């Protein structure tokens, strides 16, 4: 996972704030009054273990969301390529129908790319004959609308006797898989992790950082600044990364390369058309 300048800025700000807190405690300890309050070391260790467990679930959940998004997009791309090869093999003598279906599959993949990022714009699609792109923009779910149009064209080809029953079933399976993988993407997009859990975790980290100096201030002195810097870099960094990857389809550097995957799918389908 790469660091971006906003991430570094947030890390630096967090470290500076916690260091300012420690400097204040150190100043009070040495210049105003002696702080007799000491947190037992075992309590610090126990709280540290609890935080480690909380972060394990936090980072693990975010990574699994990222990985599930990658799998869904990969399966969609593989399904699009499989559909394109089947269409190419079944409709070699019907160039117009073949180009229509393959262009529509590219449109479907483009619409998925946009939908998972909260965009719905028919201007990003490839015009195909009488395809009502303007009407598609008004749909609540453009990918599903395009997928339905692909299914309708397959039904028409079978009714007209241009593809066999076996070919019809095979192509219909690909269309159904499109809907299944799209549903996974929509679930990831519309079901973020519970905010209460995240707020609870951040509050616990701040509480832990607040009591650490009272456990080691008499033993480490100014070296506590280095200890707290490393601690906050580690935990705050993990939280920021978790926050980024929990939305796998975003525009952050650590999010999935949705545009690159879409271009790769289009490149493969275009190669099939030209073959």
Spans of features found by a protein language model:
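Structured inter-helical modules in multipass membrane proteins
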Residues: 86-197
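Residue-level signal for the membrane-embedded core of alpha-helical transmembrane segments
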Residues: 19, 51-54, 176, 204-208, ...
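Transmembrane alpha-helical segments and their cytosolic interface motifs
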Residues: 6-15, 186-222
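Cytosolic/matrix-facing juxtamembrane and C-terminal tails of multi-pass cellular membrane proteins
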Residues: 232, 236, 241-275
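Membrane-interface junctions
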Residues: 69, 178, 191-194, 203, ...
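Amphipathic, membrane-active segments
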Residues: 74-91
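Pore-lining and gate-forming transmembrane alpha-helices of multi-pass membrane transport proteins
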Residues: 49, 215-239, 243
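N-terminal juxtamembrane/topogenic regions of multi-pass membrane proteins
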Residues: 1-74, 93, 220-222, 239, ...
């Amino acid at each position: 996972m790469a660091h971006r300048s906003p991430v570094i800025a947030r890390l630096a700000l967090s470290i500076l704030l916690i260091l300012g807190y420690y400097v204040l405690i150190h100043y009070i300890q040495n210049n105003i009054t002696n702080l007799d309050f000491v947190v037992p070391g075992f309590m610090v260790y126990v709280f540290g273990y609890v935080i480690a467990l909380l972060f394990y679930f936090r980072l693990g959940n975010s990574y699994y969301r990222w990985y599930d998004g990658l799998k869904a997009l990969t399966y969609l791309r593989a399904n699009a390529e499989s559909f394109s090869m089947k269409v190419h093999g079944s409709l070699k003598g019907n160039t117009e129908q073949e180009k229509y279906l393959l262009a529509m599959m590219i449109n479907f993949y483009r619409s998925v790319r946009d939908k998972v990022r909260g965009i719905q714009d028919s201007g990003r699609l490839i015009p195909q004959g009488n395809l009502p792109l303007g009407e598609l923009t008004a749909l609540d779910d453009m990918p599903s609308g395009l997928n339905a149009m692909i299914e309708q064209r397959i039904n028409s080809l079978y009714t007209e006797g241009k593809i066999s029953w076996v070919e019809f079933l095979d192509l219909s399976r690909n269309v159904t898989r499109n809907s299944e993988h799209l549903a996974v993407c929509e679930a990831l997009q519309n079901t973020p992790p519970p905010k209460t859990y995240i707020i609870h975790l951040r509050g616990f980290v701040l509480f832990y950082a607040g009591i650490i100096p009272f456990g080691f201030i008499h033993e480490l002195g100014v070296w506590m600044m280095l200890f707290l810097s490393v601690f906050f870099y580690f935990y705050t960094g993990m939280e920021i990364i978790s926050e980024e990857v929990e939305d796998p389809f975003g525009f952050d550097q650590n999010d999935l390369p949705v545009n690159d995957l879409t271009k790769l799918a289009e490149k493969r389908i275009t190669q099939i058309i030209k073959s």
